[in-house]
Amino acid sequence: MSLRIKIDKLRQLVTYFSEFSEEVSINIDVKSNVLYIFATLGGSINIWTIVPLNSNVFYNGVENTVFNLPVLKVKNCLCSFHNDAVVSITADHDNNTVTLSSHYTVSIDCNNEQIPHSTGTSISLGIDQKKSYIFNFHKYEEKCCGRTVFHLDMLLGFIKCISQYQYLNICFDDKKLLLKTPGTRDTFVRSYSMTEWSPTLQNYSFKIAIFSLNKLRGFKKRVLVFESKIVMDTEGNILGLLFRDRIGTYKVNVFMAFQD
């Protein structure tokens, strides 16, 4: 069983995710006809995208599968393949490897006769396939209780000024989300008006690690403004902030968990 993907799509995905992590987890859901690409960045941060299985991304198996892919290694070896190649990705869980292979065929003139000429490439990369990530992707789509917009440069500039702190307090007031430094001396406050608002938010306050917010620096090359929403589960528990980005036509989700 292997995953076959056109090299331009593969390059697009591994280039994006390698900005944040050396490896990702690939979860193929045959019934839903999609694959999930997931990475955990530390600091209670998860990043994932959902890719439909189609002619550009094809899986020939009949059962769901999960494997790990070393995106940084893959990115660095894609120059070995033809620019029009379709790359097959096969995981070997017993030997902790993943293999990329492709056969590219062209017609060449040989004594005035067109004959096929094939070039084969196979690259085996080591990665721990015993690790597994349990992540409920649908949990963060269940319920939204607020939305706002973050200007990335301004947010990063704000947290640069408060690097001596470990976390920010998050609270809500008068249709605004407030980021506040702890304590009463040298207090820094940043407020964001909310495009969607629930009055019950005023009953809550949380913490978020500055370490987590600093992870957003990886988006600085491609994102000016982040749309974000505050998500809760079906039981009404507020979970954290969900940011949105794109890789071409694919939506990317970045989730930061709140701390009580």
UniProtKB/Swiss-Prot annotation:
Keywords annotated in UniProt: Activator, Transcription, Transcription regulation
Keyword Endoplasmic reticulum listed: no
Superkingdom classification of source: Viruses
UniProt induction comment: Expressed in the intermediate phase of the viral replicative cycle.
Disulfide bridge map: none
Example GO biological process: regulation of DNA-templated transcription
Keyword Transcription attributed: yes
Family: Belongs to the chordopoxvirinae VLTF-1 family.
Physiological role: Associates with RNA polymerase to initiate transcription from late gene promoters.
Subunit structure: Interacts with the late transcription factors VLTF-2 and VLTF-3. Interacts with the late transcription elongation factor H5/VLTF-4. Interacts with itself.
Protein's recorded name: Late transcription factor 1
Organism field: Fowlpox virus (strain NVSL) (FPV)
